[in-house]
Amino acid sequence: PQLGLPFPRV
């Protein structure tokens, strides 16, 4: 669960 750009990651 982490905020990853351009898509969220686990």
UniProtKB/Swiss-Prot annotation:
Q: Which UniProt keywords apply?
A: Amidation, Neuropeptide, Secreted
Q: Which residues carry this modification: Valine amide?
A: 10
Cell compartment(s), UniProt: Secreted
**GO CC annotations?**
extracellular region
| Keyword field contains Phosphoprotein | no
Where mainly found? secreted
Name a biological process GO annotation.
Answer: neuropeptide signaling pathway
Question: What's the stated role of this polypeptide?
Answer: Mediates visceral muscle contractile activity (myotropic activity).
Q: Which family does it belong to?
A: Belongs to the periviscerokinin family.
What is the protein's given name? Periviscerokinin-3
